[in-house]
Amino acid sequence: MEPISNVEDPNSSEGDEKRWPDGPKRKRKNSTCSVKSMSALSLSVQGYIPSYLEKDEPCVVCGDKATGYHYRCITCEGCKGFFRRTIQKNLHPAYSCKYDGCCIIDKITRNQCQLCRFRKCIAVCMAMDLVLDDSKRVAKRRLIEENREKRKKDEIVKTLQARPEPDSSEWELIRHVTEAHRHTNAQGSHWKQKRKFLPEDIGQSPRAPTPDGDKVDLEAFSEFTKIITPAITRVVDFAKKLPMFSELPCEDQIILLKGCCMEIMSLRAAVRYDPESETLTLSGEMAVKREQLKNGGLGVVSDAIFDLGKSLAQFNLDDSEVALLQAVLLMSSDRSGLTLVDKIEKCQETYLLAFEHYINHRKHNIPHFWPKLLMKVTDLRMIGACHASRFLHMKVECPNELFPPLFLEVFEDQEV
């Protein structure tokens, strides 16, 4: 739709201001008011003006302010639209002039005589052959859309190419972290073949109520404690194999391990979520259902780990990505009581940068893969915090002799 100031009135025969060959100007009623209002509207809507136009360059048809090069002429939007509609709808044979085709066309009179305006368009050499019919216009729009999509794809490719991949030192770091994970990850890639399902009758009959309304099945809890010590030991061994961790003071190492132990064990369980059996495989050997893990002592923490497992299944993480995620969790500089906070923070940044570059190298198809994966760090930190609170309830409700010494050593005295 043309701006109000540029719309011609097909039923109008008199000009706002019209000249005749041998007569003075005639004024149309209310012409001053209408011209003022239209001028105000034109001034209020400042369209895009191409850089190749000089300031206030006039339209060659009516003298109004030009907006660009249209149909081989410098014209305003009104004359461009008038010329296009005239050709597309073949209106010019029906145009007529009451004054023998002698009207002067300017920005005031342009809407009063269509014939003279069209003749002026032809006189200044506006090109009729450049006006597209409906089929050509649709084809042009389709071509514009195709080019726009191509540019988008080219930009994506360019962005992907611009994303840095690991350098030689980062590849070496990734190799060390991946090997540390593989050497301490029970059953490795063969966990599905070697897992054993916890009998369904275990963990389905909770007996001891806890203060928060959940219940603990002591038989299931006892089964879980059998695998907890080797699981914790493997996390400790993983940390000791990491570059930079052994350089930290012993006190800081202990704090970091206590803080991340549940988070890393939860991650290792979550990446072994099996949607077919709806189970997690703990410590690479015991497959459990959601209710069994919940009734066996973890309560709502069980839901969080299972939900994480379902989510991570879409990411298709490889060993290096799981290993780097564990390293990032381990090197969390916000653990309470640390002495070398700055050094630990720099260590984590080193792992994060190598991690991001490795993600660039892998070229996952999931949009915004890297920020989405980093959100899983937050989820795992929440699981660790919830487990610290849950541990207090388990201590109250379960016999002390069921707790392995290493389990108590790691999880007692944690901040809730």
Curated annotation (Swiss-Prot):
Which residues make up the binding site for 3,3',5-triiodo-L-thyronine?
Answer: R234, S283
Annotated binding of Zn(2+) 1, by residue: C59, C62, C76, C79
Instruction: Give any Gene Ontology cellular component.
Output: RNA polymerase II transcription regulator complex
Q: Where in the cell is it found?
A: Nucleus
Taxonomic superkingdom: Eukaryota
Q: What are the alphabetically sorted keywords of the record?
A: DNA-binding, Metal-binding, Nucleus, Receptor, Transcription, Transcription regulation, Zinc, Zinc-finger
The question of whether Transit peptide is a record keyword is answered with no
Q: Where is the NR LBD domain?
A: 169-413
Show the SMART domains listed in the entry: HOLI (SM00430), ZnF_C4 (SM00399)
Q: Which molecular-function annotations from GO does this UniProt entry contain?
A: nuclear receptor activity; RNA polymerase II cis-regulatory region sequence-specific DNA binding; thyroid hormone binding; zinc ion binding
Record keywords: Transcription regulation included?
yes
Q: Enumerate the residue ranges of region (Modulating).
A: 1-58
By its UniProt entry, which CDD domains does this protein fall under?
NR_DBD_TR (cd06961), NR_LBD_TR (cd06935)
| Annotated residues for binding of Zn(2+) 2 | C97, C103, C113, C116
**Ranges annotated as NR C4-type zinc finger:** 59-79, 97-121
GO biological process terms on file: cell differentiation; negative regulation of transcription by RNA polymerase II; positive regulation of transcription by RNA polymerase II; retinoic acid receptor signaling pathway; thyroid hormone receptor signaling pathway
Extract the ranges annotated as region (Disordered). Answer: 1-30
What is the protein's major site of localization?
nucleus
Q: Which Gene3D superfamilies match?
A: Erythroid Transcription Factor GATA-1, subunit A, Retinoid X Receptor
Q: What is known of its domains?
A: Composed of three domains: a modulating N-terminal domain, a DNA-binding domain and a C-terminal ligand-binding domain.
Assigned protein family: Belongs to the nuclear hormone receptor family. NR1 subfamily.
Q: How is this protein named in the record?
A: Thyroid hormone receptor alpha
Classification from the root reads:
Eukaryota, Metazoa, Chordata, Craniata, Vertebrata
Provide the gene name from the record: thra1
